Structure formats: C-alpha cells, structure tokens
Amino acid sequence: MLIAGDWSESRSGGVFEVKNPANGEVITELPDGGRTDAARAIDAAYGAFPAWAAATAYDRSAILYRAWQLMIERKDHLAHTMTVEQGKPLRAAITEVQYAADFLLWFAEEAKRVYGETIPSARPDQRFIVMHQPVGVVAAVTPWNYPVSMITHKVGPALAAGCTVVLKPAEATPLC
C-alpha cells in the first residue's frame, strides 16, 4: 500500500491474494491493511493537506495533466492488468482506461477555474465575497466493476480542489 509516498507492508503483516477470475491463478499478494494502516494513511493525508491546499490552481492542474499523460502512455499496460485482474474484455478495458484518463484531463482544466464570486449587498457599504477553498482530506472508496474510471472520477476533482485523498480500492481489483 502507498502511504505518504512510500510503499509499505501492513502493520499486521497480513496479505491477501489477487486472483485472475478466468482461471483462479494468483496474480500477486498485497498488504491487507487494517485500522492501524488506515489511521496512518489518514494522518499522512492530513499532514500533506496544508502544502497541497496552498499549491496554486495552476500547479495542481499541471500535476493532474501529467497524471493524464502517464495514463495515456501506459494505457495498454493498464488495460491488460484490468483484463487479467477483473476479467473485463481487453477492448472494454482499453476504453475504460481512456475514459478514466479523460477525467484527469477534465479536472486538470477545471482546477484552473476555481472562481470566486462577489455578491451585492442590500447595504451600500458592503459586499459579499465568496472564495472556494479546499475542505480537507477526502475518503474515496471505489467499486470493482469500473475500478480505474471510478478512481479518477473521485480523486481528480478532490485533487483539483486542493484536497488530499485516502483511496480504498475494491479488494477484487486493487491493481487497477
């Protein structure tokens, strides 16, 4: 599991198997995170929040744009992984990876459009200013059936808005 930018084992040392649904073959074993690991991830996300929230909209946009580029470059590999892990036909997996990447591109552009508002007041000496600000850590739990696109659909807007994220993928499709 990835916590605070580092790959780590679960504190319990437990693992679970990821299997190919077509033949039952074990693809890999991954750390079986528990409450302690979740708490570490949440603490790390809170620790990273001030710096990420302070990043400019253009900086966040550039990072999301780079993530989009990387997904496009690795589309075939990601689709193959999805096919082996989930059983989705390769053509459908390629389509999903493209769809998922496009969410990142969309939110890379939306990150630059976090506009505020000035609202007139009934009093001549006042006006109301609305500023959109990051709210904190976002918890994202994703399903097995559209694992890649649901990750980018949830993580993309959170990162664009300046929030940090703790992602819990479906146990059936943690590699996607």
Question: Which ranges hold each PLM region?
Answer:
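Conserved small-residue-rich beta-alpha loop and adjacent elements
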Residues: E117-C176
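Glycine-rich loop-to-alpha-helix module at the N-terminal edge of alpha/beta enzyme cores
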Residues: E25-Y115, D125
